[in-house]
Amino acid sequence: MIFVDACFGKETEYTPVWMMRQAGRYLPEYMEVRRKIGNFLDMTRNPEVVAEVTIQPIDILDVDAAILFSDILNLPMEMGLPLRFEKGVGPVFDKTIDTEEDIEALDSSADEKLEYVYKGVKLIRERLPEEKALIGFAGSPWTIATYMVEGRGSKQYAKIKKMVYSNPMMLHRLLAFNTKETIEYLSKQIDAGANAVMVFDSWGGALEKEKFFEFSWNYMKEIAKNIKAKYPHIPVILFSKGVGLYMDEMDGEFDVVGVDWATPIDHALRIFKDNYTLQGNMEPTRLYSKTATKEAVEKIAGIMKGHRHIFNLGHGILPDVPVENAKYFVNLCKELTRRG
């Protein structure tokens, strides 16, 4: 698999490419399925639907890896926090973590309740072309905790950051719980057929540098270490958004570093050299323009020539991007990096 080879820094025919949120609303085929099912959460809990929409970008765009169609909040939902999606707001937990007792009440067998995810993974792997990789994923312990404590997305993260400074021991307890459950969750995705796993730390950048390492990165490292010990042949991808200035202190037993669009990829390359594969990092809104896309792909390909790299966006693809432009991006990445 070209994607797995690139994760491990092996020479490949061209630089593999996929996109975050590639199974999503910009695809008419996805929207058709969503109209039929009606509810996003119900889609994530239906293995047949999960398999269908995960494979759509492979069939339509010919990306080199499929990423499991799911949500990072399915895990805390199965821990016992009822989840709903509110129009104009996004995910909402009406029950939040406010006390030690709330942590005590969380279900420590949440990973066992996610059988619908593992069934989806198994179906996808059975139906995917052999050469295409399947990426399993989870949210980082910190990012999941922000939703569990705040109850929804936030701009200030005041509630959880208050915990950082006034009750760090309680927060560490929650993060340790999330870490244990995430290791189990990712392990079962691998057992079901995932060829790589990725940890998404969407809100790591909400923390100052010292606290980022204490409350986010160290737990992500723990997940990577455990997965690599059990599954050395499985690549582990870590992606923290908004932490470009913290990269100089990042290390650990993982294979790929996701680079967001606000971090120049040459900055990441100077820090990580070829110790890890870099994944990213075109600004997603460039996809509205083929000219802007070409400019960015040429620049990134030039910087990363001869280095460990996987093409991706620096964040998720947006819902109103023309499919034709997404295809153009994928084809261009392959064309400009083809060796020999």
Curated annotation (Swiss-Prot):
It catalyses: uroporphyrinogen III + 4 H(+) = coproporphyrinogen III + 4 CO2. Pfam families: URO-D. It comes from the Bacteria. The record marks D71 as: Transition state stabilizer. Substrate binds at R21, Q22, A23, G24, R25, D71, Y147, S202, H315. GO terms for cellular component: cytosol. Its EC number is 4.1.1.37. It is found in: Cytoplasm. One of its GO terms (biological process) is protoporphyrinogen IX biosynthetic process from glutamate. Pathway: Porphyrin-containing compound metabolism; protoporphyrin-IX biosynthesis; coproporphyrinogen-III from 5-aminolevulinate: step 4/4. GO terms for molecular function: uroporphyrinogen decarboxylase activity. PROSITE patterns: UROD_1, UROD_2. Its main location: cytoplasm. InterPro entries: UROD/MetE-like_sf, Uroporphyrinogen_deCO2ase_HemE, Uroporphyrinogen_deCOase. Keywords: Cytoplasm, Decarboxylase, Lyase, Porphyrin biosynthesis. HAMAP family: URO_D. Homodimer. Catalyzes the decarboxylation of four acetate groups of uroporphyrinogen-III to yield coproporphyrinogen-III. This is Uroporphyrinogen decarboxylase. The gene is hemE.
